[in-house]
Swiss-Prot record:
InterPro entries associated with the record: Caerin_1
UniProt keyword annotations, A-Z: Amidation, Amphibian defense peptide, Antibiotic, Antimicrobial, Secreted
Protein name: Caerin-1.3
GO cellular component terms, semicolon-separated: extracellular region
Major localisation: secreted
Amino acid sequence: GLLSVLGSVAQHVLPHVVPVIAEHL
């Protein structure tokens, strides 16, 4: 379903987004 698609997208995106956010904090 949609939630499982969003879950899979989050798993691929978060590892890239979190370090970028952390650098700005």
